[in-house]
Regions:
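A surface-exposed partner-binding patch
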Residues: 1-113, 169-231
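Compact, glycine/acidic-enriched structural inserts
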Residues: 113-154
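Low-complexity, serine/threonine/proline-enriched polar segments
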Residues: 150-165
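Generic low-polarity alpha-helical segments
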Residues: 47-50, 122, 158
Length: 231
């Protein structure tokens, strides 16, 4: 195994091993082709390339975080960002997504960007508070590989987490799949298991992106604060 990354003098391997020990093994792992690794080396942080090279793509956190290659998401980011001055599909790359429509994006300008397709929110702490940008590799470990799973889950009307009940009702998600609410929450749908279906992730995410005017938000307290519209 070859590793090129390090964080504060420690090999990226140590950090990746710690992530896998906490979150469990990668689910449904697939090999990343050498050409893909070459394309994204120097664009994405080294520790993510190390993960791809040595472990591949798949799902972490019991299926809550799906790692992906960014290429197929360019059209989705165009739909979300429109002509925004701070965000563009040209320098923002989807590197992971949750089962209900939360995207983890790497921006070469702002580093980690989060997109909540269900609620039309974009957050980028590296933009709203640049002092939080310290180390690219550490940022990937904290916000992607070691991501807190609850932020990718959704809750029902009784404030109960829905991912595990959704898996029990509909089965585990395969690569390229997501859970979608019908009708969509933006169209008055309710967050209930009875309203969930297993859907093609990209197709459904594009639909969600067309239903909302996205807002740049900041999470300074318990709830997001709108800063400005995206676009």
């Amino acid at each position: 195994m070859t590793y090129i990354s390090e964080i504060k003098g420690r090999s990226g391997k140590d950090h990746i091993d710690s992530v896998l020990k906490r979150s469990g093994p990668l689910i449904g792992a697939s090999v990343v082709p050498a050409a893909t690794l070459e394309t994204w080396t120097g664009v994405l942080p080294d520790i993510l390339i190390d993960f791809w090279r040595n472990h591949g793509l798949g799902a972490l956190q019991g299926g809550l975080m799906r790692l992906c290659v960014p290429d197929e998401f360019d059209g989705l980011l165009c739909e979300v960002f429109q002509a925004d001055k701070d965000f563009s599909h040209k320098d923002c790359h989807v590197i992971g997504y949750g089962p209900f429509g939360n995207l983890i994006v790497w921006s070469t300008r702002h580093w980690i960007v989060r997109i909540d397709l269900l609620h039309g929110r974009v957050s980028a702490s590296g933009l709203t508070d640049p002092s939080k940008k310290h180390n690219e590799n550490a940022s990937i470990v904290a916000h992607l590989l070691g991501h807190q799973p609850d932020s990718l889950n959704v809750v029902d009307d009784d404030d109960k987490k829905m991912f595990k009940p959704a898996v029990s009702a509909l089965g585990p998600l395969k690569t390229g799949q997501a859970f979608g609410f019908f009708p969509a929450l933006a169209m008055g749908g309710a967050p209930q298991i009875a309203n969930l279906k297993t859907v093609p992730a990209m197709e459904h995410f594009l639909l969600l992106a067309q239903l909302k005017q996205f807002q740049l938000v900041d999470y300074l307290g318990n709830s997001p604060s709108n800063l400005r519209p995206i676009g």
